[in-house]
Amino acid sequence: MGATKSKPREGGPRSRSLDIVEGSHQPFTSLSASQTPNKSLDSHRPPAQPFGGNCDLTPFGGINFSDTITSPQRTGPLAGGVTTFVALYDYESRTETDLSFKKGERLQIVNNTEGDWWLARSLSSGQTGYIPSNYVAPSDSIQAEEWYLGKITRREAERLLLSLENPRGTFLVRESETTKGAYCLSVSDYDANRGLNVKHYKIRKLDSGGFYITSRTQFISLQQLVAYYSKHADGLCHRLTTVCPTAKPQTQGLSRDAWEIPRDSLRLELKLGQGCFGEVWMGTWNGTTRVAIKTLKPGTMSPEAFLQEAQVMKKLRHEKLVQLYAVVSEEPIYIVTEYISKGSLLDFLKGEMGRYLRLPQLVDMAAQIASGMAYVERMNYVHRDLRAANILVGENLVCKVADFGLARLIEDNEYTARQGAKFPIKWTAPEAALYGRFTIKSDVWSFGILLTELTTKGRVPYPGMVNREVLDQVERGYRMPCPPDCPESLHDLMFQCWRKDPEERPTFEYLQAFLEDYFTATEPQYQPGDNL
């Protein structure tokens, strides 16, 4: 977003610009003006401190096995009798009933009635087994094209394209957000004034079924359009050079039948953190799959209540939520999730990398968290413990919300008293702390506190004040002042989150939109400073 003007690898000659550019945006993940775009950010990073050892609920763990943002799901139920699909990614079987396959392999779908895992037969090996349905697409369809990412937002397209690893001309095609039935071509570019940026070109559809960006050059198919602009810029900011890299998506669950799993199917390998209620480990399931495992101390919560809540939690599926994979439901309870490589946002902010983060990256992280919480809001769910310690950071500054809903189940007296030593009073809305009224609006209050954690690089809220004092002062109308170097417009947003009447606080949908458009609609003149 604002600070860096690192020059990317050249992908070919530059050409004149089309007039029908849908828009462009500044980079998200550039951290330092001295960095070169061919060099991974990880070369500047010390080993992550995955989790702290404070006496709070520590988050789940998680990984994306690739160094890029998780790609969207592009497939759904079979339509029109199509039974031959093509693999979008490699997949190694995790159980005896799974089917391994390679990217590009053709598969015949035998049974797709079980939702997330389909029974398929490989047309090359003849073997049959279950496959993750979001790893395949109908053969010869637009969904099978590597450059087609379907229904992703403009903002997510920019996050993917603005990696320093990508050369000019890196591209993807997605559905248009503004015009039904139309598509958008998003292309990475570079210029000396604006640095790395993305141009968006609307692809319109002809009544006869063809496609065009400019009416003087028309194509029978999207494939033909992409092939043409890969050879000729012809008005684009740059010819198309490289398909935008994406990571394998998370499978929905570990395998077809893995939900309540035996304890001996898990191997705990590396302890990542410890809190008052348990530990977090990196481990392996079934000898095949990297996972994070949260172990809860006996007595922390009722196994019956946990299992009931987990049935709801596993249905929450969003790219900005840590995915719950499986559980061991007998005490000690184990919670198995995706493993995310950089650990908690709190430790990330306080660590070596926090020094390199500037306001554009911090606001983008906040927008991602708001996106995940907007989904929680739509699903009529409540987090109850939203703070930086319960957000996980992956590659390319991807943020995911963890530990949603667990706080409600804790039976520890020091926690359930709501003013005990283990309760996160400084993050909790007054109506929740005093009267137990936890709603999505109390989560909005907590999000405002989380914004102070971001802008202060992990400082504890209400510095110098103890919990009892915080509760008294907030009830009297005290609100934290604007953090150093933080724009007043962002502090105003925090104040909206801290309105006394919960119904007057903004929705997460509004917060997401505000933060995603922050540097175009609210702070277009932003210039990076020494800290933010």
Curated annotation (Swiss-Prot):
Active site: D385
Region (Disordered): 1-52
Native species: Xenopus laevis (African clawed frog)
Catalytic reaction(s) noted: L-tyrosyl-[protein] + ATP = O-phospho-L-tyrosyl-[protein] + ADP + H(+)
Key words of the record: ATP-binding, Cell membrane, Kinase, Lipoprotein, Membrane, Myristate, Nucleotide-binding, Phosphoprotein, SH2 domain, SH3 domain, Transferase, Tyrosine-protein kinase
Primary localization: membrane
Gene responsible for this protein: src-a
Domain SH2: 147-244
Pfam family membership, one: SH3_1
UniProt-listed GO biological process terms: cell adhesion; cell differentiation; epidermal growth factor receptor signaling pathway; negative regulation of extrinsic apoptotic signaling pathway; negative regulation of intrinsic apoptotic signaling pathway; progesterone receptor signaling pathway
Entries under InterPro entries matching the protein: Kinase-like_dom_sf, Non-receptor_tyrosine_kinases, Prot_kinase_dom, Protein_kinase_ATP_BS, Ser-Thr/Tyr_kinase_cat_dom, SH2, SH2_dom_sf, SH3-like_dom_sf
SUPFAM superfamilies in UniProt: Protein kinase-like (PK-like) (SSF56112), SH2 domain (SSF55550), SH3-domain (SSF50044)
Lipid positions (N-myristoyl glycine): G2
CDD domains for the chain: PTKc_Src, SH2_Src_Src, SH3_Src
EC number in record: 2.7.10.2
One MF term in the entry's GO annotations: non-membrane spanning protein tyrosine kinase activity
Domain SH3: 80-141
Name assigned to this protein: Tyrosine-protein kinase Src-1
Domain Protein kinase, chain residue ranges per copy: 266-519
Record PTM Phosphotyrosine, positions in chain: Y415
